[in-house]
Amino acid sequence: MVNVPKTRKTYCKGKACRKHTQHKVTQYKAGKASLFAQGKRRYDRKQSGFGGQTKQIFRKKAKTTKKVVLRLECLSCKTKAQLPLKRCKHFELGGEKKQKGQALQF
């Protein structure tokens, strides 16, 4: 279980700052895939018409988790940076801090 606070003071690479400032932390999420990317256009063109499936569909998935990527936004200059974490099954953003002698809850 990884619990990350919603704000963190860390170095900002923005041209305005270049020092340690307060950052807002959010979890990175992949955007919607574009229909007009070259690979997608090529794939759709190849798939159209007769002949069934033309490229392999990947089925041998090996990983059970994804790496968590944090998106840090500087509160003074709005510069955004990304910070990858290690793999984890449970990720929490701004959850309650652990108390001593308490049982784990999911």
Swiss-Prot record:
Keyword check for Ribonucleoprotein, yes or no.
yes
Q: Which GO terms describe its cellular component?
A: cytosolic large ribosomal subunit
Pfam families (UniProt xref): Ribosomal_L44 (PF00935)
SUPFAM superfamilies membership = Zn-binding ribosomal proteins
Which InterPro entries does the entry link to?
Answer: Ribosomal_eL44, Ribosomal_LSU_eL42, Ribosomal_zn-bd
What biological processes does GO assign it?
Answer: translation
What are the UniProt keywords, alphabetically? Ribonucleoprotein, Ribosomal protein
Q: Which Gene3D superfamilies match?
A: 3.10.450.80
Q: Kindly list the GO molecular function terms attached to this UniProt entry.
A: structural constituent of ribosome
Protein family membership: Belongs to the eukaryotic ribosomal protein eL42 family.
Query: What is the protein name given in its UniProt record?
Result: Large ribosomal subunit protein eL42
The gene coding this protein: RPL44
